[in-house]
Design a protein with these regions (language model features):
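Conserved N-terminal phosphate-binding loop of PLP-dependent enzymes in the Aspartate aminotransferase
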Residues: 1-213
Length: 213
């Protein structure tokens, strides 16, 4: 397992950071050798990392790079999936089909369940049955099916896209009034506002106060 180096911070231009990320991955492939790399795992939007939202071109270029070297792309939709960003899965915003996708959390609406999805080509490699201590729970599975029905019936993707646009506009309006808000980023209802003090340092205390209220 190899972790790519962090190429972004709040003072870095996102476009430049995305380009640096691609170059970093190229360097890893060249250094370690593509034959030693089975797959690359990435979030379409970094959640706990700060709602870091790659530019529109990023995942297409990344997928092309990986395909050239026979490396699979695994997209982690555990936080971003199931209508949160205005589409069923966040990777859809980038018009890329990953080889494998992992999902959980919102799939069960509070019930414990996770799953992975693959392309037909990758699925063909899964030729032997596997065992799981807690897998196949019928209650969680029934809940997941109900969640999917609810998302489609009540058009939650469209709702998240619409409400997210309204919320983002409101946050940007607040940013214009208050220097505390350095940046607003994200897609749909997966949004984040970065708060900083006058010296540019993270406004941790102010963030705590806002969260408490």
């Amino acid at each position: 397992v190899h972790f790519a180096k962090t190429v972004w911070d709040s003072n870095t231009d996102l476009e430049q950071a995305a380009k640096a990320s691609i170059e970093s991955i190229k360097e890893i492939i060249q250094t370690r050798g593509a034959n030693h790399m089975a797959a690359l795992i990435a979030e379409p939007i970094q959640g706990n990392g700060g709602i870091i939202t790659p530019p529109a071109w990023y995942f297409k270029e990344l997928k092309q790079l990986l395909e050239e070297h026979g490396i699979l792309l695994i997209i982690d939709e555990v936080q971003t999936g199931f209508a949160r960003t205005g589409k069923m899965f966040a990777i859809e915003h980038y018009d890329v089909v990953p080889d494998i996708m992992t999902v959980a959390k919102a799939l069960g609406n509070g019930m414990p369940i996770s799953a992975f999805c693959t392309t037909d080509e990758v699925a063909k490699a899964f030729t032997k049955p596997s065992a799981s201590t807690l897998g196949g729970n019928p209650v969680s599975s029934a809940t997941a099916l109900a969640v999917l029905d609810y998302i489609e019936k009540y058009e939650l993707c469209e709702t998240a896209a619409h409400l997210g646009e309204m919320l983002k506009e409101g946050l940007i309006a607040l940013q214009a009034k208050y220097s505390l808000i350095k940046d607003v980023r994200g897609i749909g209802l997966m949004l984040g506002a970065e708060l900083v003090k006058e010296d540019g340092q993270p406004a941790s205390e102010e963030t705590d106060v806002i969260l408490e209220k």
